[in-house]
Amino acid sequence: MGESTRIVYDGFPELTGGTMCGHGSIGTASMLVETGMVPVSEPYTDVVLDAPSGVIRTKVRVENGRAAEVSILNVPSFLYKRDLEITTEKWGTIKYDISFGGSFFAIVNAEQIGLSLERENVDEITKLGMEIRRVVNETVDIKHPYLDITTVDLVEFYAHTDNPLADMK
């Protein structure tokens, strides 16, 4: 499985892009249950996946032989570096942290620079995220303690919301 999501169930083709993602893990577990490629039992079927970052354990709730929902227990996550800064021409100094949860993430509070995380700003958010990722990977020494993972793959922005349905999880 990989990013963008694709599931290979036979052979060893060359896989480009990222090699792991949470939604790919959920999709793979669902596919394995629904195609009968794993022994299926109701109400739950456990599926274990081996990914480049480690073992991912999934629990598939099965109804009438179909995957109804999937929960995952991902690889151990941790805070790698805290309170780092980069400077951009447009946004000035931006503080961020680097965390790990299957891959490395740069975590940015968008409120510090006045960037509203609204749909109308998606192009600006994307552009800034790509710039942050590039600069971080060019300037910060990143090395997983025991896996061969040495780059930030994703930038995640967060901000407060007044939407009562958003729980920040």
Give the predicted meaning of each segment.
Residues 1-20, 25-169:
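Active-site proximal loop and beta-alpha junction motif in alpha/beta enzyme cores
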